[in-house]
A protein has these predicted regions:
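Glycine-rich phosphate/nucleotide-binding loop
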Residues: 54, 238-340
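Short glycine-rich or small-residue beta-strand-to-loop segments that form or flank ligand, phosphate
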Residues: 9-18, 76-81, 194-200, 310-317
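N-terminal beta-loop-helix "entrance" segment that forms/cooperates
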Residues: 38-62, 238
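N-terminal glycine-rich phosphate/adenylate-binding segment common to multiple enzyme folds
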Residues: 53-165, 253
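Buried hydrophobic packing segments
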Residues: 26, 30, 214, 308-316, ...
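Glycine-rich phosphate/pyrophosphate-binding loop and the adjoining helix
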Residues: 71, 144-145, 150-196, 200-204, ...
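Buried hydrophobic positions in well-ordered alpha/beta secondary-structure cores of metabolic enzymes
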Residues: 16-19, 73, 140, 182, ...
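Glycine-rich phosphate/diphosphate-binding loop of Rossmann-like nucleotide-binding domains
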Residues: 11-28, 33-34, 159-232
């Protein structure tokens, strides 16, 4: 949908809660990067996918939302959800999950990297602290089918005969395309190491099929080392030896779990980024921080904007500007380095505001 030349149109959706505070800082840094590297970015702001919009209109997004954002090169997203006002399944299925499915964003990509100035809660076996960069992995999650299907139902509700069923859906095209993305990513990295998450010893139909497709895909990538772990022991390995992993690929549910656990092992989810990708570039991809809307701290200008900035860097990379991505990431690392004396938000031991940190990263560029 886009190449590295020409104007890039970005649909900006701040959403709910702290998204309204982190998004301006993300845009600030993206504008600084665009200026530095000569990238022509145009930001179009939208107020839907939020409680405020739902309160006014009775739905999370307008009926013509696809027309409004479908022609953009990317979607830059803040956060969605306000559980005290609207049920999560309403806000998510009415916005974020619609983007993922209607725009066929079949890859959810999350880096988990130990950054300077962040103390990892998982130490080495000898009890010593891990160094920046010692944990450096990507979690690749299948994002449009799998366990998160809407196929199923409820029978005889409220009676002793009540039955609830929900089906896992795996298609060959759905599994193969996310595996291909993961193998290509692993091949591009120095370690060339891919780990598959499974549970074929307990889930007797879909997970053996997943394993079969991994084995078949591996034949086309003889240069990539492949291993697999059942999800229960894999979560233990994430905690005990996170430095072992390079690229981890998983189904929708397992990937959802691992892609939160991975960043948590690096010290804080507050700075973690995420991308919902349509690698075929037929539709815009969506870039969002891992953190939620955090209504408990919304409106106080204390949220950490680094996750928002980092996912913006991923957006620049996907749009063909790897140099800008690298520069933004280096600016984040510089601000996080305790030796820099740069401002830090309260979640990582500082007292600075959201705005202070955003300005510091932009200045570091």
């Amino acid at each position: 949908m886009s190449n590295s030349t020409g104007k890039k149109r970005i649909a900006v959706i701040a959403g709910d809660g702290i998204g309204k505070e982190t998004m301006p800082e993300g845009v600030r840094v993206m504008e600084a990067a665009a200026s530095k590297f000569g990238i022509d970015l145009a930001f179009d702001h939208f107020d839907f996918s939020s409680w405020d919009y739902y309160e006014k209109h009775g739905q999370m997004m307008p009926d013509n939302w696809k027309d409004l954002v479908g022609g953009h090169d990317a979607i830059y997203f803040g956060a969605v959800g306000w559980p005290e006002k609207i049920a999560d399944h309403v806000s998510l299925w009415g916005s974020l999950l619609l983007f993922r499915r209607e725009f066929d964003q079949y890859v959810n990509l999350r880096p988990a990297r130990l950054m300077p100035g962040i103390i990892a809660p998982v130490v080495r076996r000898d009890g010593s602290a891990r160094e920046p960069g010692e944990i450096d992995m990507y979690i690749v999650r299948e994002n449009t089918e799998g366990e998160y299907s809407s196929i199923g139902g409820r029978m005889f509700p409220g009676t002793e005969r009540e039955i609830v069923m929900q089906e896992t859906v795996m298609s060959r095209i759905g599994v193969d395309r996310v595996l291909k993305f993961a193998f290509e990513l692993a091949r591009s990295r120095p370690e060339k190491h891919l780990t598959s998450a499974t549970k074929s010893n307990g889930i007797a139909i879909t997970m053996p099929y997943w394993d079969e497709r991994v084995a078949e895909m591996a034949k086309s990538y003889p240069d990539v080392k492949v291993d697999k772990f059942h999800i229960d022991i894999l979560t233990a390995h994430f905690v005990q030896r996170p430095d072992f992993f390079d690229v981890v690929v998983a189904s929708n549910l397992f990937g959802d779990i691992l892609s939160d656990l991975g960043p948590a092992c690096t010290g804080t989810i507050g700075i973690a980024p995420s991308a919902n990708l349509n690698p075929d570039r037929l539709f815009p991809s969506l870039f969002e921080p891992v953190h939620g809307s955090a209504p408990d701290i919304a409106g106080r200008n204390i949220a950490n904007p680094i996750g928002q900035v980092w996912c913006g860097a991923m957006m620049l990379d996907f749009l063909g500007h790897r140099d800008a991505h690298d520069a933004v990431l280096q600016a984040i690392e510089k601000v996080l380095d305790p030796r820099s004396g740069a401002p830090r938000t309260g979640d990582i031991g500082g007292t600075a505001s959201t705005t202070d940190v955003g300005r510091a990263i932009a200045a570091a560029l």
